[in-house]
Structures are given as structure tokens and as C-alpha cells.
Amino acid sequence: MNTFEIINKDFRECEIPVGLVITDPPYNQDYSYNQYKDKLKVNDYVELLSKIPQPCVIIHYPEETINLLPLAMKSQCEQVVTWVYNSNTGKQSRLISFWGCKPDFKKVTQPYKNLKDKRILQRIADGKTGARIYDWWEINQIKNVSKEKTEHPCQIPEEVIRRIIQTTAKEGELIIDVFGGSGTTSKVAYELGYNTISYEIDPKYCEIAKKRIESVNEPGSEVSQDTL
């Protein structure tokens, strides 16, 4: 049985094990978190991002992905996926950047679009289930009326994390989130059969994450003081 661990600490104070980090860091946009001031000086913010271990997949707004992440990582990313969504604000997309790892889009398929095309019909006859997904993902944001919605102010849709894991993670690889939030990364990883660790400084969000993961099925780990 796979296991999960929720650690109520700043990841910078911990020894991070080897694994694939999938995370959406605080965006430095002055979001209202319980125990974190989301408005650092640029240099301090870059320093925070630089502590994210590689290999990693980082979800961020386009400006920060282009301008700040290369400074923090001291390199260029291997691949970028654009995640787009409908929004009433000016921000209608985020970039998913891959550092020290690369997605294999053939691992996830989408339905064929032109079912009258002879080539498509032949592929279906050959047992193909669909076309590989693109590097452009249209997935709705989590809104207040969304079934997935928790008390966390900035929540990533489970489908975004699911595609990242399915296209990028190796079999048996440990999935890590260093900005755990409401536990979406660990919940999806746990559902998919991966062992997972989530680091989060806010005990309230840790408790939300724990309940979400335990709702999948019987939890696979005992919970200590550090892991709530």
C-alpha cells in the first residue's frame, strides 16, 4: 500500500528526500494566507524559489516563469506547458515548467477529434485509444462553487496535477510538494498509487490536506506530531 506524510514545517528546515517535486509556490501577489506574507521583496522571493529541489515541476504565472524562475534555478527549464482557463480577471493562464525532468505526452491520450478521417478510423481499429495530449491544457480553475474547493485561497485543480504526474513521474517515484497547501498534489499522487510527502507551514491547511487524502481510501501511514 502506498503511503503519505504531511509535515507541518517549512521545507527549508527539512532534509528533502529524493523524488519528483510538483508544486505551486506562493505567487508573491499578496494573497491572503493564514501564516504567510505573500509579498516579499523580489530578491527574497527569488531566494525562496531557489530552494525548491530539482527535479521539479513548478506552476506559476507567465511573467514570473519567464523572468524569475530562471534566476532562481540558475538554468533554463526543459519544457513548458500552458494551462489556460476562463477568468474574469486579466490573468487567464499559468505556465507549468519542468526543471531537470521532461513530460512524455504520449502517456496520456485525448479523444480523436475527426472520427471521419480514414487514418483516425484505422488507428481506432488498431486499438489506439486517442491522440497524445498537447502542451496546451484547458482546465477550469477552482471556483467557490467547485466540488474540489477547500478553505485554501489558491487551489490548483486536481486534473492539472494528475496530468503532470501521469506524463512525468517514473514508476515508484516519490512525489513531493514543498508548498503543500490544501494537499492537492499529495491527494492525486496517493490516488495514482505513489508515495507522497507534503510540506506545509500552516497547521490548518495540513489538517485539510490530511482529511482530503484520507478520503481517498484507508490511509497508508501513521501520523506523527510533525506530520499531524
Where in this protein do the model-derived segments appear?
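Conserved SAM-binding loop
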Residues: 209-210
